[in-house]
Amino acid sequence: MNLPYEVTNTKQYERDVKLAKRRGLDIEQLLAVVRMLRVNEPLPEKYHNHLLHGDYKGYWECHINPDWLLLYEKDTKIRIISLYRTGSHSDIFGNGKKR
């Protein structure tokens, strides 16, 4: 049996979640994805989970819905999922740089 991953998050992720709540997004959808990641369950294809490149090399991106993303890092050696950002494409990639 595989042990679950520890889940950590950034302060920016916490701010992003607050913004998502203010926008009326269903946070349960986000939490459902985090739960799947925590137990290393493969995400269904509808989430379009994939590795990023360039400035975001090493980060994973999945789509909670078409314009609601979750960016995270996954360290398989020490079994930690680090939640980095969540928000729209423009929230995260708007200026082309990491925030």
Placement of each model-derived feature along the sequence:
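Enriched for short, Lys/Arg-rich terminal
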Residues: 1-6, 15, 25-27, 67-69, ...
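N-terminal first-folded block
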Residues: 8-44
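Short histidine-centered beta-strand/loop micro-motifs
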Residues: 19, 61-63, 73-74
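A short, surface-exposed loop/turn module that caps and links secondary-structure elements
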Residues: 36-63
